Structures are given as structure tokens and as C-alpha cells.
Swiss-Prot record:
<comment type="similarity">
    <text>Belongs to the universal ribosomal protein uS9 family.</text>
</comment>
<dbReference type="InterPro" id="IPR020574">
    <property type="entry name" value="Ribosomal_uS9_CS"/>
</dbReference>
<dbReference type="GO" id="GO:0003735">
    <property type="term" value="F:structural constituent of ribosome"/>
</dbReference>
<protein>
    <recommendedName>
        <fullName>Small ribosomal subunit protein uS9</fullName>
    </recommendedName>
</protein>
<dbReference type="InterPro" id="IPR014721">
    <property type="entry name" value="Ribsml_uS5_D2-typ_fold_subgr"/>
</dbReference>
<keyword id="KW-0689">Ribosomal protein</keyword>
<dbReference type="Pfam" id="PF00380">
    <property type="entry name" value="Ribosomal_S9"/>
</dbReference>
<dbReference type="GO" id="GO:0003723">
    <property type="term" value="F:RNA binding"/>
</dbReference>
<dbReference type="InterPro" id="IPR023035">
    <property type="entry name" value="Ribosomal_uS9_bac/plastid"/>
</dbReference>
<dbReference type="GO" id="GO:0006412">
    <property type="term" value="P:translation"/>
</dbReference>
<dbReference type="InterPro" id="IPR000754">
    <property type="entry name" value="Ribosomal_uS9"/>
</dbReference>
<dbReference type="InterPro" id="IPR020568">
    <property type="entry name" value="Ribosomal_Su5_D2-typ_SF"/>
</dbReference>
<keyword id="KW-0687">Ribonucleoprotein</keyword>
<dbReference type="GO" id="GO:0022627">
    <property type="term" value="C:cytosolic small ribosomal subunit"/>
</dbReference>
Amino acid sequence: MAEVLQSLDALGAANVAAVQPDAPVHVQKLDKYGRAYATGKRKNAVARVWVRPGTGKVTINDRDIEVYFARPVLRLMINQPFQAAAREGQYDVVCTVSGGGLSGQAGAVRHGISKALTYYEPELRSPLKKGGFITRDSRVVERKKYGRAKARRSFQFSKR
């Protein structure tokens, strides 16, 4: 009986050693100009983002961030990935964004910056993932249904 237990233990140890795969190795992905490129999405907005080492300048659609996003809340939203990664003022960001409204566009830029930072510095993936910046927010507007006023709102009901 002891021999059977020893052989089963050995079998279990062998299976555990064989089954455990190595963690995926994330490598740096840069273009020929030394920039990391990523696309970010939020609602109907799509942002194409390029990140490179610099002074912290953010340019959106050839305009400065203060001009494009006048609301301070949206500017704070865009800087969140840098704060989570402790890299404020170390990267320049150039992005083009289209579709959706300003809030969706800010979310798309934030998503793109987060992905581009992980391409530039793969070790930043863990803190950004923990902050929820890499995961795409899949919530989109629910479509309007026929026979209803809006997506869920019914027309006013009259009993008589």
C-alpha cells in the first residue's frame, strides 16, 4: 500500500511539474521611431495613441490637452494611467481621437495610453491592470426598440 501511495505522489508531482506553464513574457513593442502605439476605445470613441519618452506633453488631434479637453475632470482622467504607474511627466503623448462625445473620447485616450505604456514598459502591466486601465470598458448605449419610446422606456399607458 505504501508503494502505491509513493507512486501516486510521484505521479502527482510529475504532473504538477509538467502542467505548470511559464508565465507569458511581455516584450517591448516599439515602432521605428522609438514610440509605442496602441488603440483605445470607449463607447463610440476610438483613439490612436503614440507614447515616447519626453516631458509630459499631451497632444490630441494636433491641439494641446488644455485646449481640447477644457473640463479639468477629463484632463485628470487622461493623466490617471501615469499616476498609477508613477510615470508623470516622463512621456510625451500624441493621439488622434474620433467618434463619440468628449467623455467617451477621454476614456478612449486613457485606454490607449494605458496599453501603449504597457507596450513601452511591460513591467507596468501589473499596476495598470490592477487599476483597471487596460481592460476595455464594454458598456455601450443600448439600442432603441420598436414599440417603445426609448431602449426600455415604454409609451405612456392609458387604462381608458
